[in-house]
Amino acid sequence: MRKNILVLLCVAFIIQFTGLLPLQAGHYYYKQISLKDGLPSTVRCILTDEQGFVWIGTRSGLGRYDGHELKKYVHQADDPHSIPHNFIYQMIEDEQNNIWILTDKGVARYRRQSDDFFIPTNESGNNIIVYSVCLPKGGVLFGSKNKIFFYNYQDASLRLLQSFEREPNYNVTLLTLWDEHTLLCCSRWQGLLLLDLKTGKYN
């Protein structure tokens, strides 16, 4: 009995100090970011981009955390390249590593080289208010009030793709690709629509 116990102790000792255990507890470093660090407000959404920056969307502006410092972006009325509004409710990074920010007063695309924002507008020159976004091949789809817009990578243009004329109060709050040629559109109060991207027909 004593011999068996001694053998078990020796085996345990060898495993402990030679790293033979297949599962080792990992060590993780956590840092809390709060208002004291410059966090604008209540967090609404978070995105980690391709370069490792953490983007934090809040009710009072946008934050970018690099692991050491938090930089804040807010709307400035005299700056056309600031974010359109401080209330941020969604962010996404597309296949070209563009970061799109959906705000209460329009959508914005972050420009890394100039560290500011491009604000696309419609034919009338007004900011495009969008509620949802998804990433098909070749561009970005945005859901708006009874409309869907498409941003084309090739010519960097934003155009109206679809108008739901029979559904004047249809706010497209969720977009997802059903298949390669079909888009599923969801409205919080008005139900679902399936849109054929080739024909423009929906039901």
Language-model regions, residue ranges each:
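Carboxylate-rich, polar loop motifs that coordinate divalent cations or form catalytic acidic clusters
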Residues: 1-203
